[in-house]
Amino acid sequence: MFGTLHTNSAQGTVNRIIDAFPGNLQDQIRTQLASTLIGVVAQTLLPRIGGGRCASYEVLVVTPGVSNLIRENKTFRINSAMQTGAKFGMQLMDDALFEHWKAERVSVEDALSKAHRPDDLAKRIVKARRGEDDDPIPVPEDE
């Protein structure tokens, strides 16, 4: 099944689905969602340098580990799982924004305006401009 929600992150989408139900049903919903959800894609559009628009995506693939996080009400750890889940096709929005900036598709200002953690993205961009390692800054588990 496909659905759309107005959220700006994969983690936010999972939380919004669960929060749509009364508190007394949320444990059951978490269990059902953990066993049925396959993935979440969050997207945003940015102005492209030179005209037009550029789509940036956050991708969550529901692996057994992510499924456990949903079931155990530990959705605050989803971003950490996504950061280490590139081999499964996962991508955080800020990583996508960084790649668009690096490829000179979007401006720094536009990338930072859509970033979930703009301070960390700004630090990463500064490091990349200096020619330093551009590895993502680890996501705190409380986000």
What are these regions (language model features)?
Residues M1-E143:
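Short, flexible helix-loop junctions that flank or precede catalytic/ligand sites
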